[in-house]
Amino acid sequence: VILKTTASEYWSYVKAGAEAYSKDNPDVKVEVKGATSETAYDEQQNMIETDLNSGAYDAFVIAPLQADLVKTLIAGQTAPIVAVDTNIDAPEVLSFVGTGNEDAAAEGGKAAVEAAKAAGWDKVQAIAISGVQGDGTATARLTGYEKGVTEAGGEFLKDEIQYADAVADKAATSMEAIMQNHPDGVAIIVCNNDDMAMAAARAAKGNAAYAKTIFVGFCKGC
């Protein structure tokens, strides 16, 4: 099992689940690993290449940081492969396990607009603090947020997307930049995951212009 990273709470849960399966099924040996961050592309690539060529494994579960690259790496593989979190568009992949990111984000965007209106915002604008730029999961969530916000009558500021590599600390820095650029406040901040949303909200705490801002997360650190 090769995850995007093992350095976040969300992925630690995934790791624990895989290891629990191995414990409950002693005839199946599961090895779980992951990159040190969601931008450690070369590190994950080396893991995948090494394990595919080792001959030591009968099946693979991969959460790709770069799905197009992994598609090339697994070409011609006959061992079963399952994609997790971000799909890999390749015939070698038997199944995909993950969230309907675009649809779920769209629902979140719609709910955020309604909450912003209820909070008293006349100008309902949304800015996104996203994950890793170019990542399929992050892109799907952005697309969904934009769709949901727009359909509910809000304005999604697409040109002001902040990319924070799915990391809470960077999300806080992005929020500082947003507050500097929008001193009068922004109605909605949509984030790639819950950890980022909480970090952004903490960064805005004490700023009266953001007292009624709606912060939207997605999932715990994913």
Question: Language model features by range: what are they?
Answer:
Residues 1-222:
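A residue-level marker of the well-folded mature domains of exported/periplasmic proteins
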